[in-house]
Amino acid sequence: MTRILLIRHAHSVANDRGILAGRSAGVILTEHGSKQASDLAERLKGVAIAKIHISPLERCHLTINPLLKKIPVKNRPKIVITEDLSEVDYGKWTGKKLVSLYRDKLWKVVQDRPSAMYFPDGEGLANVQVRAMRAVHTAANESGLQIIVSHGDVIKSIVAAVLGTHMDNFQKIVIDPASITVLDFDGSNFRILTLNNTSTPIAELAKIVSKKRPARALLGGGAGRKRK
């Protein structure tokens, strides 16, 4: 059983200005985002992390830095930077204000048929899902708790894939800045334990339960977590 935490970067200056940052350099966190990153470190306090898989973009690294500072150097998890977790290449849309993009004829495609969307001089959202799931499967084949730090649309594509829903339902999924989504992988199937969580301590959900038989979904919904 592998447990994976999907973390979206905290609130950035591009989020604040309503700009589609894409892969632009120098996109840092706002004051609010820095507070979110500190709160995230508190929420993950005491969690034994085996490895962190992270986008190469600065805002993701700034999000996870407060957590790393709380971990003694000798105990810090290995960090793997992977392009598969990078932000969507929005091509010519990069750096533009979202309000101006609403008027673009392709905006309706993004909203209604994201599987068909290919950003001008950029990449297609369907391609994003393929590379994102490649990173997830890499993490799932590792031992111990894995953390993935990435971007909103990338994580939305992962959630859609894990749920087995069509990519055209992608926009029905919400992933907020500094949110945590928790996945379990039993060797053949993924399950979502929590989605877009921005407030509760995560240590209990981060625990990996070792069982001879992998956990299965129960009819009737199951009894929930054991009460202490």
Indicate where each model-derived feature is located.
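Phosphate-coordination/substrate-recognition cap region in phosphate-metabolizing enzymes
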Residues: S38-K108
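Short, basic/glycine-rich phosphate-binding loops at helix/coil junctions
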Residues: R17-L20, K105-M117
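Residue-level preference for the first positions of well-ordered beta-strands
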Residues: I4, S143-V149
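Glycine-rich phosphate-binding loop signature in dinucleotide/nucleotide-binding domains
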Residues: G46-A48, A139-G144
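Active-site metal-binding loops of divalent metal-dependent hydrolases
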Residues: A10, L145, G152
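Loop-to-helix element that buttresses phosphate recognition and phosphoryl-transfer chemistry
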Residues: R8-L62, P66-L67, Y118-M133
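General small-molecule cofactor/ligand-binding pocket signal
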Residues: L5, V80-T82, L193
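Acidic, low-complexity terminal tails and accessory targeting/binding regions
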Residues: T2-R3, K69, V88-V99, A161-K228
